[in-house]
Amino acid sequence: MSGRGKGGKGLGKGGAKRHRKVLRDNIQGITKPAIRRLARRGGVKRISGLIYEETRGVLKVFLENVIRDAVTYCEHAKRKTVTSMDVVYALKRQGRTLYGFGG
């Protein structure tokens, strides 16, 4: 052991950088039937064809904001793993309190 303690936050030997796959156009993974099911749950009977792209755009912006806040909480705590509590606090910060995930 090199005496760095929990997490090993020292400099280390460097190691190989991991290559991350560039993620793009994943918003299309939110399929038309998935959006339709969400609308049905909200009580919508009939859906315009233009709704699907608009919904994807709105969902993308919402998730970007929540994830940015959750990652900020995570970085402040000097962790590399985003926990459910980070997400709960991020949602609370935006005025959308979520119950049932601890805290």
From Swiss-Prot:
Subcellular location: Nucleus; Chromosome
Region (Disordered): 1-20
PTM-bearing positions, type N6-methyllysine: 21
In-chain residues carrying the UniProt-annotated modification N-acetylserine: 2
Protein keywords: Acetylation, Chromosome, DNA-binding, Methylation, Nucleosome core, Nucleus
Pfam family, one: CENP-T_C
Residue ranges of the annotated DNA-binding region, renumbered to this chain: 17-21
Transmembrane annotation, as ranges: none
Gly residues compositional bias, start-end: 1-14
Major subcellular site: nucleus
KW Ligase (keyword) present: no
GO MF annotation terms: DNA binding; protein heterodimerization activity; structural constituent of chromatin
Matching Gene3D superfamilies: Histone, subunit A
Subunit structure of this chain's protein: The nucleosome is a histone octamer containing two molecules each of H2A, H2B, H3 and H4 assembled in one H3-H4 heterotetramer and two H2A-H2B heterodimers. The octamer wraps approximately 147 bp of DNA.
Function: Core component of nucleosome. Nucleosomes wrap and compact DNA into chromatin, limiting DNA accessibility to the cellular machineries which require DNA as a template. Histones thereby play a central role in transcription regulation, DNA repair, DNA replication and chromosomal stability. DNA accessibility is regulated via a complex set of post-translational modifications of histones, also called histone code, and nucleosome remodeling.
Protein name: Histone H4
Species for this entry: Solaster stimpsoni
